[in-house]
């Protein structure tokens, strides 16, 4: 699945926040892939000595969040869901790669799944019908409540991992279930704790994030633009710009690096909806996705 998804995501050339797939194949009993050389993942950066008291400042995690939403949006708009987003699967570009060094890349599509298919004859994307139940896929620390309930995962469930990770990165704070490795106990906390309980140490502008996600079903599209604006508000409150140093950086920002698409303060990219999917397939469309 990994090479299949990366091939699709790179079909139109180098993609933002996605490593290039340069070579892949199978020889004897071994499968191989050659892709863009990246840097450290967020888990490594969080625990490194570069970061004081662990965790990240609000100015850093707000920009990480925006780039993460951008990466997920690109994956979703190519008809896939990731199903295992966590700090181990989000990588910075290699520090010697000036174009990618400050960019968050999403990786590890081994649990990925197409949730929609493009039909050339109809010239439209058609969503797959949700299964009545689905196996648990992902990390139980960051998985959405829907995953614990064995519901079909959609775009919203990828985004559910976002607040959980950001809470963990927020100055080294802990999730309520941070040190609990009992799946049943983690499940009960996720299902019973209110968003206010979970987000108690977060900026007020983030309060709407979890209630919004809780209101969506498998077919509905998360409001990427609203989520973007939440993170952008945190940036503004912290007097941070996209060019500011991340917590792990020592050198001054390189102002010659071209701005990324997400740096537009209006968030125009996040307002687009090329799949035009926000509900279940019509009876006429069902035959195309079965």
Curated annotation (Swiss-Prot):
Domain Protein kinase: 1-240
Gene3D superfamilies linked: Transferase(Phosphotransferase) domain 1
Cysteines engaged in disulfide bonds, as pairs: none
Gene Ontology MF terms in the entry: ATP binding; protein serine/threonine kinase activity
GO CC terms: cytoplasm; nucleus
Domain of life of the organism encoding this protein: Eukaryota
Ranges where the record places region Disordered: 244-263, 268-290
One BP term from GO: signal transduction
SUPFAM superfamilies for the chain: Protein kinase-like (PK-like)
SMART domains: S_TKc
Domain free text: The protein kinase domain is predicted to be catalytically inactive.
UniProt similarity note: Belongs to the protein kinase superfamily. CK1 Ser/Thr protein kinase family.
Name of the protein described by the UniProt record: Inactive tau-tubulin kinase ttbk-6
Species name: Caenorhabditis elegans
Encoding gene, per UniProt annotation: ttbk-6
């Amino acid at each position: 699945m990994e090479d299949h998804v990366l091939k699709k995501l790179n079909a139109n050339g180098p993609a933002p926040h996605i490593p290039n797939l340069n070579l892949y194949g199978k020889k004897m009993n071994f499968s191989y892939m050659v892709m863009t050389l990246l840097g450290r993942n967020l888990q490594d950066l969080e625990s490194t000595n570069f970061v004081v008291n662990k965790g990240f400042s609000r100015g850093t995690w707000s920009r990480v969040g925006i780039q993460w939403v951008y990466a997920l949006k690109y994956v979703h708009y190519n008809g896939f869901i990731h199903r295992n987003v966590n700090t181990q699967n989000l990588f910075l570009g290699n520090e010697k790669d000036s174009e990618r060094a400050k960019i968050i890349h999403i990786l590890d599509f081994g649990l990925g799944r197409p949730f929609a298919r493009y039909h050339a004859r109809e010239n439209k994307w058609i969503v797959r019908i949700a299964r009545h139940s689905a196996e648990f896929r992902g990390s139980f620390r960051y998985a959405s409540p829907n995953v614990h309930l064995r519901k079909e995962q959609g775009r919203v469930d990828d985004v559910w991992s976002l607040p959980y990770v950001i809470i963990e990165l927020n100055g080294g704070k802990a999730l309520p279930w941070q040190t609990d490795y009992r799946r049943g106990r983690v499940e009960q906390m996720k299902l019973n704790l209110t968003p206010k309980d979970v987000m108690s140490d977060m900026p007020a502008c983030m309060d709407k994030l979890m209630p919004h996600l809780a209101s969506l079903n498998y077919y509905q599209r998360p409001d990427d633009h609203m989520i973007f604006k939440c993170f952008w508000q945190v940036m503004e409150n912290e007097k941070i710009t996209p060019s500011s140093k991340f917590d792990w950086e020592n050198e001054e920002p390189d102002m010659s690096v071209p701005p990324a698409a997400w740096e537009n303060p209006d968030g125009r990219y996040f307002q687009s909806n090329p799949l035009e999917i926000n509900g279940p397939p019509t009876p006429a469309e069902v035959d195309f996705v079965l």
